From Swiss-Prot:
HAMAP family: UPF0060 (MF_00010). This is UPF0060 membrane protein Mfla_2554. SUPFAM superfamilies: Multidrug resistance efflux transporter EmrE. Its main location: membrane. The keyword Coiled coil does not apply. The chain crosses the membrane at residues 7-27, 33-53, 61-81, 83-103. One of its GO terms (cellular component) is plasma membrane.
Length: 110
């Protein structure tokens, strides 16, 4: 159960970060409303707060979180940007998730 909660927290954190960066992108590159900066700032603040909830040493959390971020970003590419990821994208995201699992869930003496 710990593992499921950890991965779910990583996914929610990644979504908060991606949304917080995607909304300013829409404003800057697609001429959307500057009001998008308000939910973007809220989303990035949520992202920073969520990072404090992760149950391990900060460096380990950031390294493992990177693997989940890669997976969520590829999923975002597919669902939001409507671009079908390549097999290489899926392979890379799978390798990143494997790395995350090793970093977060490997047995440790301390």
């Amino acid at each position: 159960m710990f593992e499921l909660k950890t991965v779910a927290l990583f996914v929610i954190t990644a979504l908060a970060e991606i949304i917080g960066c995607y909304l300013p992108y829409l404003w800057l590159n697609q001429n959307k409303s500057p009001l998008l900066l308000i939910p973007a700032a809220i989303s990035l603040a949520l992202f920073a707060w969520l990072l404090t909830l992760h149950p391990s040493a900060a460096g380990r959390v950031y390294a493992a979180y990177g693997g989940v971020y890669i997976f969520v970003a590829i999923f975002w590419l597919w669902v939001v940007d409507d671009i079908i990821p390549s097999n290489w994208d899926f392979l890379g995201a799978s390798v990143a998730l494997l790395g995350m699992a090793i970093i977060m869930f490997a047995p440790r003496s301390t």
